[in-house]
């Protein structure tokens, strides 16, 4: 085939992606994949030529400078030589003249004879200077030649590096040089024409964009070349690497630095994204994959945030949120010696059993008459002294709400509980409630049997009734003291105080008297004239006027202190209740009050606590509701089901409590944390919030104050009128806590009558359904002589030529077993399904 034929048969339009060409030798089709982007070798050559020209010009300039310096040195040498000659001439002229005699002509020629001798003497000096000049000139020329050679080598090396950079960048961008060895001149010419047309079309369509992109690429190449040249210049010397080992043809990929993430107890999704330097949507996507739906402002707990951060490749640092608080608390002087302190006593009991009368009598009898006169301000706590000089502090907490609130906040302010029971009335529902509160707080009980002056009083009946509630008197071998008293007539009051002191000696109550004080808030309110007022019971140390107090979310300097009688005091020791003025706000009952050194740090801690409380309130887990009990149990949050039972009659309460106790198993236990007769009160709601319990009301309702607490604390409250419904719902909740069971049920059986071979499915068993239904998507077993030889699933299920989803009893079908071809006549195919069996109590 001639060149003209090849040229005529050349394609009119060549694709830029794939080209096929036939070699002349063997006629094989060669597929060549090319890209339209090509390396601009002309630019590389131009850069090489410019570098070489620049180096040559620099060498010539240096040679010219050296030549000028040599000529200047030569001129200076000649000037010195002339000066020396002039000096010799002057010496000759200054010599004395020789007198000439008339007849002495031969002597007149003597100076002419001496002149050649002097010139001969000066010749060695000239020759030495000429030699020095020649040597200096030779050295300068040699140095210039060496410098020119070095510059030329450097220019060649730079050109070679530019070429290498261009080649490596071409390799990085996936660009390939055209291999012209296997391409004819006609194909190359057609390629170039097609490339020119494509470039022209592209330039018309997206000229501005392409120019910008081209400019960006050129700028990038120049920046990379400059950066590498700078590295090469720095690397020259003894330790400089040679060849391409020093070159990097691509920019080293920048690895994203996974910063350490510091996570507190709670954090919002936006804050976590900011710390991880990612978009919040990435965190939301990650949590969606983990099964959690969150918003950008949602607060998540520390454990969840840790899982998300580790999932996204970050190292997590868990921070204790109380570092600042701990630092402030550690800077306290609490190393003083402990001394015995007075007991703190709370009097509890049924409303009508004389609790208030007993408190009033003790106060009137044991407080000095001068202090007791007039109107005294009742602050909820006061202390009295016995005849032998010992002191007792009484807390007057209306009802049991404040007492339960203290327990809910972890503050144990009470040492001893005095349980007041009327001798004529016996044990009442609120009496039982008081016993439950005392046990929850871990405080010992002293029983005061009141109203013994009445004719119908029966103290023995009280002891027997309390025995049923595990309050065993000393008479029956227990450790609970029973003291008969009469608040109206003042009988047995001293015996009661003595019993309290005896119990305190058993407890061995001690506290630090000297040093910075700490205590608990009994109650607080906002006074119009005095501002926030808090009653603080000092538990250790001494509270002085002017101290800086950190009290829950509030702080402040003690501006004034008053005792229970309204008298100004300057200090208060352990077990002394005082009114404190000067706080920034009204603290909550049960908050811990602590004296600190620095008011600024106290303010920081108070503000931190406020923010933390808001976050924890948003992020706290959902309360134990019946609907979510199963999920809570699977997560390991609930170990037992706490219940508070309130009913209309005592019989119903006992029946419900007994039935609930019988429902308990080894896996799930029901714990009745409170029970009683009557409507649901605020006390019950507070106890439920503290114990994380479910409230059950049987034929009773909650009052307004209780409903407010229930709504605020998100407590689960259920009303029932039929006891079976109550027990069934509790059973359902407990059953949800149990681990589910799975059971296999056989739904169909088919007998193999014949076996066929199919090119696609392999062995096809012609079967007759003998029992139940054979379903296409259910797991199966192959039985041979009632022995399971294979367990798997169906590949196909057909009736005649139609694919079906199920075949019923008495019908024929073709069954293909997936991944099993050893089906034989007489085998049985058993179809079953896995059913979850819910466990029940």
From Swiss-Prot:
Residues 450-453 are annotated as: G4. Residues 340-510 form the tr-type G domain. Residues 374-378 are annotated as: G2. Residues 396-399 are annotated as: G3. The keyword Repeat does not apply. Residues 486-488 are annotated as: G5. NCBIfam families: IF-2 (TIGR00487), small_GTP (TIGR00231). Belongs to the TRAFAC class translation factor GTPase superfamily. Classic translation factor GTPase family. IF-2 subfamily. This is Translation initiation factor IF-2. Signal peptide: none annotated. InterPro entries: EF-G-like_DII (IPR053905), EFTu-like_2 (IPR004161), IF2_II (IPR044145), IF2_N (IPR006847), P-loop_NTPase (IPR027417), Small_GTP-bd (IPR005225), T_Tr_GTP-bd_dom (IPR000795), TF_IF2_bacterial-like (IPR000178). GTP binds at residues 349-356, 396-400, 450-453. It is found in: Cytoplasm. Keywords: Cytoplasm, GTP-binding, Initiation factor, Nucleotide-binding, Protein biosynthesis. Residues 1-12, 52-92, 114-170, 188-202, 213-235 have a biased composition (Basic and acidic residues). GO terms for cellular component: cytosol. One of its GO terms (molecular function) is GTPase activity. Residues 349-356 are annotated as: G1. Residues 1-24, 52-246 are annotated as: Disordered. It comes from the Bacteria. The lineage of its organism: Bacteria, Pseudomonadati, Pseudomonadota, Gammaproteobacteria, Pasteurellales. Transmembrane segments: none annotated. One of the essential components for the initiation of protein synthesis. Protects formylmethionyl-tRNA from spontaneous hydrolysis and promotes its binding to the 30S ribosomal subunits. Also involved in the hydrolysis of GTP during the formation of the 70S ribosomal complex.
């Amino acid at each position: 085939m001639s060149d003209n034929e090849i040229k005529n048969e050349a394609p009119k339009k060549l694709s830029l992606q794939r080209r096929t060409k036939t070699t002349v030798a063997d006629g094989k089709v060669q597929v060549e994949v090319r890209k339209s982007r090509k390396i601009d070798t002309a630019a590389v050559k131009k850069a090489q030529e410019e570098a070489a020209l620049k180096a040559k010009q620099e060498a010539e300039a240096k040679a010219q400078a050296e030549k000028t310096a040599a000529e200047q040195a030569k001129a200076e040498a000649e000037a010195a030589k002339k000066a020396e000659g002039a000096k010799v001439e002057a010496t000759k002229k200054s010599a004395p003249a020789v007198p000439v005699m008339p007849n002495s002509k031969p002597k007149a020629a003597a100076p002419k004879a001496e002149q050649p001798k002097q010139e001969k003497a000066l010749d060695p000096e000239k020759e030495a200077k000429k030699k020095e000049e020649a040597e200096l000139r030779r050295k300068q020329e040699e140095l210039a030649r060496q410098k020119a050679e070095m510059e030329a080598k450097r220019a060649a090396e730079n050109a070679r590096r530019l070429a290498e950079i261009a080649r490596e960048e071409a390799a990085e961008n996936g660009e390939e040089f055209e291999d012209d060895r296997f391409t004819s001149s006609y194909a190359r010419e057609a390629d170039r024409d097609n490339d020119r047309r494509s470039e022209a079309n592209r330039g018309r369509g997206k000229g501005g964009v392409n120019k910008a992109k081209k400019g960006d690429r050129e700028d990038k190449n120049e920046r990379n070349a400059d950066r590498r040249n700078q590295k090469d210049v720095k690397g020259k010397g003894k330790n400089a690497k040679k060849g391409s080992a020093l070159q990097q043809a691509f920019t080293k990929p920048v690895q994203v630095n996974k910063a350490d993430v510091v996570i507190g107890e709670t954090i919002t999704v936006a804050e976590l994204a900011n710390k991880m330097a990612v978009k919040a949507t990435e965190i939301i996507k990650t949590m969606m994959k983990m099964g959690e739906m969150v918003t950008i402002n949602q607060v998540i707990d520390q454990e969840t945030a840790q899982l998300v951060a580790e999932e996204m490749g970050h190292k997590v640092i868990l921070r204790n949120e109380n570092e600042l608080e701990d630092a402030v608390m550690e800077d306290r002087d609490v190393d003083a010696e402990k001394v015995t302190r007075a007991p703190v006593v709370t009097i509890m009991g049924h409303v009508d059993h004389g609790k208030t009368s007993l408190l009033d009598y003790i106060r009137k009898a044991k407080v000095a008459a001068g202090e007791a006169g007039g109107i005294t301000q009742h602050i909820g706590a006061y202390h009295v002294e016995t005849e032998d000089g010992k002191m007792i502090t009484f807390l007057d907490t209306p009802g049991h709400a404040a007492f339960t609130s203290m327990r809910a906040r972890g503050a144990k302010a009470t040492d001893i509980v005095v349980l007041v029971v009327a001798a004529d009335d016996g044990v009442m529902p609120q009496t039982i409630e008081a016993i439950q509160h005392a046990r929850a707080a871990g405080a010992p009980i002293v029983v005061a049997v009141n109203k013994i002056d009445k004719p119908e009083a029966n103290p023995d009946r009280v002891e027997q009734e309390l025995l049923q509630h595990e309050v065993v008197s000393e008479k029956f071998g227990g450790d609970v003291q029973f003291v008969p008293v009469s608040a109206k007539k003042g009988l047995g009051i001293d015996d009661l105080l003595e019993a309290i002191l005896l119990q305190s000696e058993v407890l061995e109550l001690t506290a630090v008297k000297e040093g910075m004080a700490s205590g608990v808030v009994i109650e607080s309110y906002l006074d119009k004239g005095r501002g926030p007022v808090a009653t603080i019971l000092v538990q250790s140390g001494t509270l002085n006027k002017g101290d800086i107090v950190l009290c829950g979310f509030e702080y402040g300097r003690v501006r004034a202190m008053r005792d229970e009688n309204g008298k100004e005091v300057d200090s208060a020791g352990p077990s002394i209740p005082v009114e404190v003025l000067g706080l920034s706000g009204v603290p909550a009952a049960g908050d811990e009050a602590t004296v600190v050194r620095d008011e600024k740090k106290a303010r920081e801690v108070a503000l931190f606590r406020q923010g933390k409380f808001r976050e924890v309130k948003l992020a706290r887990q959902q309360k134990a509701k019946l609907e979510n009990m199963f999920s809570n149990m699977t997560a390991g949050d609930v170990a037992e089901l706490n219940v508070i039972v309130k009913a209309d009659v005592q019989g119903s309460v006992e029946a419900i409590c007994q039935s609930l106790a019988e429902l308990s198993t080894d896996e799930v236990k029901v714990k009745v944390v409170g029970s009683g007769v009557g409507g649901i009160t605020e006390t019950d709601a507070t106890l439920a919030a503290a114990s994380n319990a479910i409230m059950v009301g049987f034929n009773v309702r909650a009052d307004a104050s209780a409903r407010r607490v229930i709504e605020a604390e998100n407590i689960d409250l259920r009303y029932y009128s039929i006891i079976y419904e109550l027990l069934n719902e509790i059973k359902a909740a407990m059953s949800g806590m149990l681990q589910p069971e799975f059971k296999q049920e056989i739904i169909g059986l088919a007998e193999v009558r014949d076996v066929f071979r199919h090119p696609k499915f392999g062995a096809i068993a012609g079967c007759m359904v003998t029992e139940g239904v054979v379903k296409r998507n259910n797991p199966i077993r192959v039985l041979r002589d009632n022995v399971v030889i294979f367990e798997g699933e169906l590949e196909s299920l057909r009736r005649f030529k139609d694919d079906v989803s199920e075949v019923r009893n008495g019908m024929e079908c073709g069954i293909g077993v997936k991944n099993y071809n050893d089906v034989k006549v007489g085998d049985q195919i058993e179809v079953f399904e896995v059913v979850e069996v819910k466990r029940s109590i």
